[in-house]
Swiss-Prot record:
It comes from Solidesulfovibrio magneticus (strain ATCC 700980 / DSM 13731 / RS-1). Keywords: Isoprene biosynthesis, Lyase, Metal-binding, Multifunctional enzyme, Nucleotidyltransferase, Transferase. PANTHER family: 2-C-METHYL-D-ERYTHRITOL 4-PHOSPHATE CYTIDYLYLTRANSFERASE, CHLOROPLASTIC. It holds the Pfam family IspD. This is Bifunctional enzyme IspD/IspF. The lineage of its organism: Bacteria, Pseudomonadati, Thermodesulfobacteriota, Desulfovibrionia, Desulfovibrionales. GO terms for biological process: isopentenyl diphosphate biosynthetic process, methylerythritol 4-phosphate pathway; terpenoid biosynthetic process. It comes from the Bacteria. 4-CDP-2-C-methyl-D-erythritol 2-phosphate binds at residues 242-244, 276-277, 298-300, 303-307, 374-377, 381. Gene3D superfamilies: 2-C-methyl-D-erythritol 2,4-cyclodiphosphate synthase, Spore Coat Polysaccharide Biosynthesis Protein SpsA, Chain A. Its EC number is 2.7.7.60, 4.6.1.12. In the N-terminal section; belongs to the IspD/TarI cytidylyltransferase family. IspD subfamily.
Length: 400
């Protein structure tokens, strides 16, 4: 089958004009691209779709086509993308989009650009129904509210909810049938979706399950949902690990000894650690874990121990810089799990103070920070009391 999509981006957007500063909703910026681009890329990624015709209002056609060409040059979706001028009514815009389809097109999906969150599963459900022989297919959702028929301010009937459905796009059609339905319709017959024309033509229309997230941007309050849903955050995890040797007068290292700090908290009476900075092994591991959440490299790359500027630098500075860089890349930290591995000193007397200090450095509450301490049962260099290790695991969300 040759399945094409007609993407309608020709609406006037009058209900949103004031809230959007006069910008038509199909041209609202979402992640640096106009709203219609998000829907276009969803169809372009579908293996069922052979091409897309984008319908713009006549007054927008030239500029929008030039803008679209620029987006296609930068990130071509890999299938033909054509444009057409819209008409006075929605059905006129659809008709013009149908006229722009290539001769090989046999099936068509009609979609409103004001539904930018159409997903691959919904497109596939409509396409599969067409491939199975259905000639008119629409996605629907159950109506959960009680629906009343009214005349002015008076209720005239309560409609049976189980017989009602909320309709979405994309709506799929056999192209020949849809063209016949358009040709059959009276000039004064106005419709709000294409399935209505097919119904009026006397042909059956079938349904597939819609998608709740496939909302239509219509009212000013929808803009908040648009901003939140435009770039849904993805879960991320960062891992950090660090080691420091203890100072030993019999075996001095290349780096100077520093009083022990863990999580920015001084550990009095503990062995000194060898370090270029202040040697806070826990904050070093945590800094690496934060950087790991955003593919930001590691602490040694950002703060090399060969740089004298970092001599005895407080590790909280490293963590603060890493947090700024990570937040600039869209990171929100939700939980931190920390482990200190050492034979000495004993961590439990200091654990709560360390935990609270780390939470403060991260801007989290203490329930979002877990701290554990363990030994290696006398094994390895920590078991021999020659050093200390720390492991950090950071969980969060990142907006693309």
């Amino acid at each position: 089958m040759s399945l094409w999509t007609v993407l309608l981006a020709a609406g006037s957007g009058t209900r949103l004009a004031q809230a959007s500063g006069g910008v038509k909703k199909q041209f609202l910026s979402v992640g640096g691209r106009p709203l219609y681009w998000k829907a276009l890329t969803a169809f372009a990624k579908s293996p069922d779709v052979a091409g897309v015709v984008v319908v713009f209002a006549p007054e927008d056609l030239a500029e929008a086509t030039r803008e679209l060409a620029g987006f296609l040059d930068a990130n071509h979706p890999g299938l033909p993308v054509l444009t057409a001028a819209g008409g006075a009514r929605r059905q006129d815009s659809v008709k013009n989009g149908l006229d722009a389809l290539p001769r090989e097109a046999r099936l068509v999906l009609i979609h409103d650009a004001a539904r930018p969150f159409v997903d691959a599963g919904l497109i596939a459900r409509v396409a599969d129904a067409l491939a199975a022989g259905r000639k008119a297919v629409i996605p629907t959702l159950p109506v959960t509210d009680t629906v009343k028929q009214v005349d002015g301010d008076r209720v005239t009937a309560t409609l049976p909810r189980h017989e009602l459905a909320a309709v979405q796009t994309p709506q799929g059609f056999d192209l020949t049938l849809l063209r016949q339905a358009y040709a059959h319709a009276r000039p004064d017959f106005d419709v709000t979706d294409d399935a209505s024309l097919v119904e009026h033509y006397g042909q059956p229309v079938f349904t597939v399950p819609g998608a709740p997230r496939n909302m239509k941007i219509t009212h000013p309050e929808d803009l908040a949902s648009l901003a939140e849903a435009a770039a849904p955050p993805v879960p991320v995890t960062g891992y950090g690990y660090d080691v420091h040797r203890y100072a030993d007068p019999r075996n001095p290292g290349k780096q100077p000894p520093r009083p022990m700090k863990l999580g920015g908290f001084p550990i009095l009476g503990a062995p000194e650690v060898l370090a270029h900075s202040d040697g806070d092994v826990l904050l070093h591991a945590l800094t690496d874990a934060v950087l790991g959440c955003v593919a930001g490299g590691d602490i040694g790359r950002l703060f090399p121990d060969s740089n004298p500027d970092f001599d005895n630098m407080a590790s909280g500075v490293f963590l603060s810089e890493a947090l700024l860089a990570a937040k600039a890349k869209g990171l929100t930290i939700t939980h931190v799990d920390l482990t200190i591995i050492a034979q000495i000193p004993k961590i439990s007397p200091h654990a709560e103070a360390i935990r609270l200090n780390v939470a403060a450095l991260l801007g989290l509450n203490k329930e979002q920070v877990n701290l554990k301490a363990t030994t290696e049962e006398g094994l390895g260099f920590t078991g021999e009391k020659k050093g200390i290790k720390a492991v950090a695991l950071v969980s969060g969300w990142r907006r693309p």
